[in-house]
Amino acid sequence: MFLKRRSTKGHELTRNVVSEVWCDFVDRVSSRLRQQPHRECVSLWLTMLLLALAILFGVAPATVAQSKPDKDYLVYVLSEAADTISLIRFGPGGARVDHEVPTGDMPIDIDGPHGIAISRDQEFYYVSLAHGRPFGTVWKYSTKDDRVLGRTTLGLFPATMDLSRDGSLLYVVNFNLHGDMAPSSVSVVATEPMLEVARIQTCAMPHGSRLNPQGTRHYSVCMMDDMLVEIDTATLKVSRHFLLTKGREMGMSGPPVAKKTDGPPAKHLDMGGHGMEPPKPGDISCSPTWAQPSTSGSSIFVACNKSDEIVEVDAAKWSVTRRIPARPGVYNLAITKDGTHLLATNKRDQSVSIIELKSGRELARIPTRRKVLHGVVVSPDDRYAFVSVEGVGSEPGTVEIIDLAALKIVASVDVPEEAAGIEFLRIEPAK
């Protein structure tokens, strides 16, 4: 496991610091020890020696006892560059790929599976295939045998998506990664016949499709317009939008006004790296990549990928509540089921942040084995988080598994290249 990898330089620095602290501590207590009876003196010195050795060699007891799972946790993950769906099984024996399913129908080009959603009854799952000729598609699968049950064509580069509470409607953002910087849309798909029943125009490069817990509002963000967009699920129309740029925050009713796209595209709109580009000097844009409603639906948390912060928007007042500092390239978000902690993948920082929502304080920054972080999902019992890491070039993708009590990675498993969308299936008896 990568947590055991420590550089020699870092270890020497740690030892030097501990040595200085230890010597200072010894100097301060030596005079007191001389006044103690011999038996107490020896006992105290032994205790101090054991503590020093534990610190020096990293064997100090953990503050939280770590235990292996006694059941199997099943997670689906997509590999965008390999047209593969993998089912990950994590249990008492560790983490492994249970099986893989090929997806797509283009014999030469990559179809690019990007987003995944699973029905609440755990009978079906849906996968968006972002690439197309030119339009992408969404496919419906059975969780029993991974059989394709239906498909439908959507817009340009369909990406993240979410399901209504009853599973009848699927909300898919048409990200339009490689197209003109024009307003794109959210497709609404009836899942029984697999038919697109609405295409709702929003703004440029929508991403991060999420419904509130009540199922009454859908939220997405637009990377190129710095906006959070709310859709009323009863009318299937944009009800409000919110400008997220720091110093220019503004909540407005109705849909955004479409910008004119005459003339050549602006140079700063190159999004080939999709969240990997650091901001240029003077750039104050948010470049949002995810919208995550709270467990009560009273707040929406937005990942600002360029300004490296998480913006909390009050759903009732439609105003900014606070800006939480984040790591470079904060990308996808997830909230624990008890509503107390927010998890963030940091695409440019090669790490995952665990944030206490009440205080906004980062409890842990957890490095990952490979670069280019993508998605994160929390198990229903709030015990583990599963993180997809794309990797670079020919590297395999990775699923890293975090123990949320110990705040450390406890398992890692390789999957095909460019691990992207990730979703939790179920917990079942261990095999």
Where are the regions that the model predicts?
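Short, low-complexity, charge-dense intrinsically disordered segments
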Residues: 4-34, 39-44, 53
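Generic detector of short, well-ordered, non-transmembrane alpha-helical segments enriched
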Residues: 4-7, 61, 314
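Short, isolated positions within intrinsically disordered regulatory regions of eukaryotic proteins
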Residues: 7, 19, 26-27, 49, ...
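Residue-level detector of intrinsically disordered terminal segments
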Residues: 46-50, 54, 193
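C-terminal segment of classical bacterial N-terminal signal peptides
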Residues: 54-63
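Predominantly soluble domains enriched in secretory-pathway, periplasmic, or organellar proteins
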Residues: 63-431
